[in-house]
Amino acid sequence: MLQIPPENVWIALAVTLAAGLATAIGSLLVLFSRRPNPRLLAFGLAFAGGAMVYVSLSEILNKSIASFALAYGERTGFTYGTLAFLAGVIVIVLIDHFIPNPHDSLDKQDPAFRENSREYLKRVALLTSVAITAHNFPEGLATFFATLESPSVGMPLAFAIAIHNIPEGIAIAVPVYFATQNKFYAFSASLLSGLAEPVGAALGYWLLSGSLSHATFGWVFGLIAGVMVFLALDELLPAAKRYAKGHETVYGLVAGMGTLAISLVLFKW
């Protein structure tokens, strides 16, 4: 079993908490501004998507393969790493099937804005909060274990997830605020959803701490890579395209990949 220094655990948990708290930033944008700039939102979503795809395929998947190679040998390690990646995709597909993540638009012409029924908005708020909270658990695991094993990978990943969490905070705060007309409730709902990330990280570490090995890290990193790539392709990039007026999606995607590439190079020096 691998021995993890306690200070590394606290650092990883703090990084995960910081990424999760970005949902609160999203709620503040709703409560203290007239309306988020859709083109800037499109760029930010695509930036996060590009960053997550790049770090998942260039670093996290490779760490899965390397961990399996240390446990079982190079050839078997590559096979297991690939299987773990595909397993991660399957896991998040199942989660997305049973608990769909609402892709709420911020357009004031949407039914949620036109609907006069307070009860309808309350249902929208509840379903949105539950769905996004459920999706935040695997993101918390991803940030925590990536930082635990390699801060040079975990920190950029946490940054990408934090950007991704800002529009999620918006998606929660909008229906809650319109349903309750209470800024505190809207802020609290977004904040609690983001706290699901460090909670998921703590639960994951508690369950796996007694069996941490090269093979365990191999499975965790492979699953994380699959989950992150699916989230980027299924949620972030389509949402960015919906809000874009021009080439913001492409520019954001390239900027996200480029920023992560440069940051990973700098972390190596």
UniProtKB/Swiss-Prot annotation:
Annotated HAMAP family: ZupT (MF_00548)
Catalytic activity: Zn(2+)(in) = Zn(2+)(out)
Signal peptide, first to last residue: none
Name of this protein: Zinc transporter ZupT
Membrane topology category: Multi-pass membrane protein
One term under GO cellular component: plasma membrane
Keyword Acyltransferase: no
Residues noted as binding Fe(2+) in the record, renumbered to the chain: 136, 139, 165, 168, 197
